[in-house]
Amino acid sequence: MASQGTKRSYEQMETGGERQDATEIRASVGRMIGGIGRFYIQMCTELKLSDYEGRLIQNSITIERMVLSAFDERRNKYLEEHPSAGKDPKKTGGPIYRRIDGKWTRELILYDKEEIRRVWRQANNGEDATAGLTHIMIWHSNLNDATYQRTRALVRTGMDPRMCSLMQGSTLPRRSGAAGAAVKGVGTIAMELIRMIKRGINDRNFWRGENGRRTRIAYERMCNILKGKFQTAAQRAMMDQVRESRNPGNAEIEDLIFLARSALILRGSVAHKSCLPACVYGLAVASGHDFEREGYSLVGIDPFKLLQNSQVFSLIRPNENPAHKSQLVWMACHSAAFEDLRVSGFIRGKKVVPRGKLSTRGVQIASNENVEAMDSNTLELRSRYWAIRTRSGGNTNQQRASAGQISVQPTFSVQRNLPFERATVMAAFIGNNEGRTSDMRTEIIRMMESAKPEDLSFQGRGVFELSDEKATNPIVPSFDMNNEGSYFFGDNAEEYDN
């Protein structure tokens, strides 16, 4: 972990802990994972799901969403104060899929939120276990990142759709805390700030009064989070300027867009964690695995080992390719939506194809789809090697990158060159000086122009055999740099809609 001075590791953020040593961190993360697993087993019992049905990823997602909804206090309060027809604010539910006479059927279930909170607390030693909830949110966020593109959202805030590699965590709820902030990409936070500034421009009272004071605190906090992700002094200084602005307006929006673009080359530090579906943890707990005793890490070999021997199923639509569905879920499990496909492919030991070539839609199934026509297949979530997840953007250099996505955000700490199309990125900076022209801008552009191909993005780290649990023998893969490395290249993914 880089600079462990004042920074808490993201395991600590994840578990809300104070500073702990490695063993304590592994134990508290293990406790969190075990709690999710115990909760899942109990829910499967309550819903009378068979073993096979409990391993269905669609059922896992429904159960996960129910517990998130049960603990969403803000929304629960809102629903109680603004009752809408046909919606019981005290209940939550979703589709559960059962196998009846060789066919899949959908059953819509409704549950008391209170009851679900009880089951969750019981599984977590009577505590609210917010860390476990955040963990589930990050898994959903990683799944969204791999499934959808955010072109519309990018365009609405004045950013360029080719900046999609900066949008990790863009669907995470506000309440996801420090662990959520750690996994958000530079573009995601820039976009949240731009939305705030736009509201302030349109609504004169946005920054005024008691509410305005709270808004201002939130604005400055978010600026600091974004500042902390940048690795160069000039980018950080520019964030100070945005934060200290008396009355944030268009100049700040331009500065934020400029900074987000600069992150395509001067990459920010964004954490990556392997968050798996609840059913995977449930299976492990059911087979007698004691997560708290064994300890667990979201950024090491543990999630890879867990996926090596977990069998998870998924419903597959008639014209979908099961191998492609597996790739989608594998990428989501390892938070690898914006990783270089060549690196992902090497680790997975299977070719990983760009989003546009996948014959699969998202994992979740809409209520108007005919489930009876669907089959279920085993998801192939195993890997050939494992690698440590990174929380840095790596150093930067030139390679050919693609038209659709013009940069990557590395997930795995593996020595390689990072591809980006300097000409394309730099072209985005020409003739846009609505924001302040400053020494900082000039300095940032100079650094971007001088980024050299020789700078390896990760020195000395490689991938490891699955038998090498202590990461003693790194294998440094060699990549064919002429291949396409971007996942969203020439893309036709669906848009993310709430």
UniProtKB/Swiss-Prot annotation:
Residues 8-22 have a biased composition (Basic and acidic residues). Late in virus-infected cells, may be cleaved from a 56-kDa protein to a 53-kDa protein by a cellular caspase. This cleavage might be a marker for the onset of apoptosis in infected cells or have a specific function in virus host interaction. InterPro entries: Flu_NP. Residues 1-22 are annotated as: Disordered. Encapsidates the negative strand viral RNA, protecting it from nucleases. The encapsidated genomic RNA is termed the ribonucleoprotein (RNP) and serves as template for transcription and replication. The RNP needs to be localized in the host nucleus to start an infectious cycle, but is too large to diffuse through the nuclear pore complex. NP comprises at least 2 nuclear localization signals that are responsible for the active RNP import into the nucleus through cellular importin alpha/beta pathway. Belongs to the influenza viruses nucleoprotein family. Homomultimerizes to form the nucleocapsid. May bind host exportin-1/XPO1. Binds to viral genomic RNA. Protein-RNA contacts are mediated by a combination of electrostatic interactions between positively charged residues and the phosphate backbone and planar interactions between aromatic side chains and bases. This is Nucleoprotein.
